[in-house]
Amino acid sequence: MLCFSGTLGCTKYGAFLLILSYRSPMARNDGSSLNESDSCLTTSVTAFFRVMCTEWLSMSAYNKEVKFFELISCLKREPQFSAKDTVKERVLKITLASCCSSLFSIRDITSCPLSSGSSFTKSQTSKMYCQLSLLNLGSVAFNSAFLILIADDDIFVNGFLR
């Protein structure tokens, strides 16, 4: 399971770098530079790093050494924690916030405009960004589910992750 989760992570980061290289000015046929219509790229980068922060928070929940609110601002919808929340409940809230964030990112990405001189059409670019967002969502869901399954295993939580 850990190997599969790692493979998902590498695939996700590789897809991000591939899309980033396609959208760079050097990859364009017309030699134009980045402009306002490339806010799609900014949206994608923001969504990507937001999901990375969510994964980091999920892992830190089990280390119990990192404060939850250090990177919680990365999420569009901040989960509300109470003092009575268990570790598992906090991870569930983080996962839910991440899913909402990814869905909103897909909505934003599919509606962003592209200039007519771009080397990609709107539909092609939107499809690529949507696939990346869905890959992020799937990776977070899988990682969080795995962490929730082992949440009650004190030996794993207190031993392996420390």
From Swiss-Prot:
Chief location category: membrane
Q: Which is a Gene Ontology cellular component entry for this protein?
A: membrane
UniProt subcellular location: Membrane
In what way does this protein cross or attach to the membrane? Single-pass membrane protein
Q: Which domain of life is it from?
A: Eukaryota
> What stretches pass through the bilayer?
132-151
**Keywords annotated in UniProt:** Membrane, Transmembrane, Transmembrane helix
Q: What else is known?
A: Partially overlaps HSE1.
Q: Write the protein's name.
A: Putative uncharacterized membrane protein YHL002C-A
Species source reads Saccharomyces cerevisiae (strain ATCC 204508 / S288c) (Baker's yeast)
